[in-house]
Each structure stands twice: as C-alpha cells, then as structure tokens.
C-alpha cells in the first residue's frame, strides 16, 4: 500500500522541510519491510481567489485530481477525531492487509477543506483542539505515520 500526503502550500527550505523529509525517509525505510510501497508528498499551490469560498473550491478541485481511485482518504480537520497513535497504526495496518491500494491524507489550505472532501474521508483526523500552522501539521502527520509504522513493526520508538 502506498501512502500519499496531499497538502496545500509548500514547505520552504529550512528546518521544517528537513524535519518533514527526515520522517518521510524513516517511514520509507521501515515501511518497505512492512509491505508499504512508499510515502509521497504532493504539494499544491494555495488558491489566490478573492474569497474563502472560492479558495476552498479551487483547492478542493486540485486536491481531488490527485486522489487515486479506491484510496482510503483521511482528512485533517480541526473538527476531526483525536486518534491515538495505536489507532492510526491499526487503520493503516488494516488497509494494507485489506489490499487498499493507498491511503491518502489531505491537508487543506488556510481556509480548510471543502465539505465534499470531508464527506468522502473514511476518517477525519485532528491533532487536538488547537489550530496549527499547516507547516507544523505536515510535520506532525509525517511523525505520526512514521510512529504508526514503528507500532506495526514492534519497534521501540513508540513507548506507550
């Protein structure tokens, strides 16, 4: 199973990009041993539409164009569920075992994701009740994906 993170906005060169890349590389190395076929990050430009409704719609169209058929979609949302790391690992492991071709994680722009993208998601995931910058959310997500891999592998990184 392939994992894809589709994110509106780009991480500029610097410590945030380096940390995100470190977690992506760690998961790729570990994931191959667990039956995962990689972790891709798709960065999409932020909409320049004048109003929030237009920005959300433009970004939703761009995101939807990158979601493969039969993917398990996870939408990051401040109104989502707070899952613990073990639960996220169970979802990824189950999808892998059920031969789901890929899991796609969606990170919207500053105005959030469209209602339609939220509806098609199997899971709406939040990282607490706080509002996070999109750059930090991407790092948190990549760390949690790596942590899920370590849980599935029985690796001591996760000490719950």
From Swiss-Prot:
S-adenosyl-L-methionine binds at residues 76, 108. Its EC number is 2.1.1.177. It is an enzyme of class 2 (transferase). InterPro entries: Alpha/beta_knot_MTases, RlmH-like, tRNA_m1G_MTases_N. Pfam families: SPOUT_MTase. GO terms for cellular component: cytoplasm. Coiled coil: none annotated. The keyword Methyltransferase applies. Disulfide bonds: none annotated. It catalyses: pseudouridine(1915) in 23S rRNA + S-adenosyl-L-methionine = N(3)-methylpseudouridine(1915) in 23S rRNA + S-adenosyl-L-homocysteine + H(+). GO terms for molecular function: rRNA (pseudouridine-N3-)-methyltransferase activity. The keyword Ribonucleoprotein does not apply. It is found in: Cytoplasm. Keywords: Cytoplasm, Methyltransferase, rRNA processing, S-adenosyl-L-methionine, Transferase. Homodimer. Specifically methylates the pseudouridine at position 1915 (m3Psi1915) in 23S rRNA. Belongs to the RNA methyltransferase RlmH family. This is Ribosomal RNA large subunit methyltransferase H. It comes from Afipia carboxidovorans (strain ATCC 49405 / DSM 1227 / KCTC 32145 / OM5). The gene is rlmH.
């Amino acid at each position: 199973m392939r994992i894809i993170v589709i994110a509106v906005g780009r991480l500029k060169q610097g410590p945030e990009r380096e940390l995100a890349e470190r977690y992506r590389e760690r998961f790729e190395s570990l994931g191959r041993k667990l039956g995962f076929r990689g972790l891709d990050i798709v960065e999409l430009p932020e909409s320049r539409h004048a109003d929030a409704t237009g920005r959300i719609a433009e970004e939703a169209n761009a995101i939807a164009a990158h979601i493969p058929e039969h993917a398990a979609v996870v939408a990051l949302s401040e109104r989502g569920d707070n899952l613990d790391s073990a639960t996220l690992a169970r979802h990824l492991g189950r999808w892998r075992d059920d031969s789901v071709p890929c899991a796609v994680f969606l990170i919207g722009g500053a105005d959030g994701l469209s209602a339609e993208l939220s509806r098609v998601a199997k899971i709406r995931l939040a990282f607490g009740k706080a509002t996070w910058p999109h750059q930090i959310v991407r790092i948190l997500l990549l760390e949690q994906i790596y942590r899920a891999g370590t849980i599935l592998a029985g690796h001591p990184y996760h000490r719950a």
